[in-house]
Amino acid sequence: MTKETQSFEEMMQELEQIVQKLDNETVSLEESLDLYQRGMKLSAACDTTLKNAEKKVNDLIKEEAEDVKNDESTDE
């Protein structure tokens, strides 16, 4: 599954698996580097997903506050 089609939860699960593999002392240096690189890409993708979600939540809160303010001004 590519990172473009993975959900946030799937990316986090893959990150956890990568950490477990990296903790295994039998992993070769080359494989460790590959795992680290993949982990960094997943971490960046998760960060972007979280920032986008945070922006959406903040936008919704702002929109709701504006609606409440408009409702209050029409009541007066």
UniProtKB/Swiss-Prot annotation:
EC numbers on record: 3.1.11.6
Broad class of where this protein is predominantly found: cytoplasm
Keywords of this entry: Cytoplasm, Exonuclease, Hydrolase, Nuclease
EC primary class: hydrolase
GO molecular function: exodeoxyribonuclease VII activity
InterPro entries: Exonuc_VII_S, Exonuc_VII_ssu_sf
Pfam families linked to this entry: Exonuc_VII_S
Biological processes per GO annotation: DNA catabolic process
GO cellular component: cytosol; exodeoxyribonuclease VII complex
Catalytic activity entry: Exonucleolytic cleavage in either 5'- to 3'- or 3'- to 5'-direction to yield nucleoside 5'-phosphates
Keyword Nucleotide-binding: no
Keyword Cytoplasm: yes
Subcellular location: Cytoplasm
Record-linked NCBIfam families: PRK00977.1-4, PRK14068.1, xseB
Functional note: Bidirectionally degrades single-stranded DNA into large acid-insoluble oligonucleotides, which are then degraded further into small acid-soluble oligonucleotides.
Quaternary assembly: Heterooligomer composed of large and small subunits.
Family (UniProt): Belongs to the XseB family.
HAMAP family for this protein: Exonuc_7_S
Protein's recorded name: Exodeoxyribonuclease 7 small subunit
Species: Staphylococcus aureus (strain NCTC 8325 / PS 47)
